[in-house]
Amino acid sequence: ESGTVNLPGIAGLYAGVKFVRAHRAEIEEYELALCDRLRARLREIPGVRILCDDGQAHMAITSIVVPGHDGGALADALDAADIAVRAGLHCAPAVHAWLGTLQSGAIRFSPGLYNTAQEMDDTALLLARLLQA
């Protein structure tokens, strides 16, 4: 074996795993609240289709389609504003075929522990502006 073992990296990984295990419930609750807030704001934007059932248990992921708009171009515009999303089929073409989004794909938002409620509002506001342009 060549080189030096990355002990600081191993220690950092251990500390991160330890933190997440200790606060898993709080992290999940916070991330789900962010997604609920984002979905509420997205529902206010005409033409946005949210790909989930209301009232069902969810992960902290929200996917949308906007008929008549290129998801990749919208994702690029959001990225230019430092809003990280993923556009496409998300390695799930069979699900997209079932949803009727196989041709368009979707835009996926996955807020995390270090995101804020204000960022959810800002994200929806920017998306609304992009769709009006």
Regions found by a protein language model. Give the residues of each.
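Glycine- and other small-residue-rich loops at beta-strand/loop junctions that grip anionic moieties
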Residues: S2, S63, G112
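Conserved beta-strand segments that form the floor/walls of ligand-binding pockets within enzyme
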Residues: G12, V65, A84, R108-S110
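Acidic-histidine catalytic/liganding microenvironments
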Residues: L42-P46
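Structural signature of PLP-dependent enzymes
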Residues: E1-I10, Y14-R39, L51-H58
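Buried hydrophobic packing segments
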Residues: L13-G16, V95, T123
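Conserved PLP-binding catalytic core of the aspartate aminotransferase-like
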Residues: L32, V48-P93, A97-L99
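PLP-dependent enzyme catalytic core of the Aspartate aminotransferase-like
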Residues: A97-A133
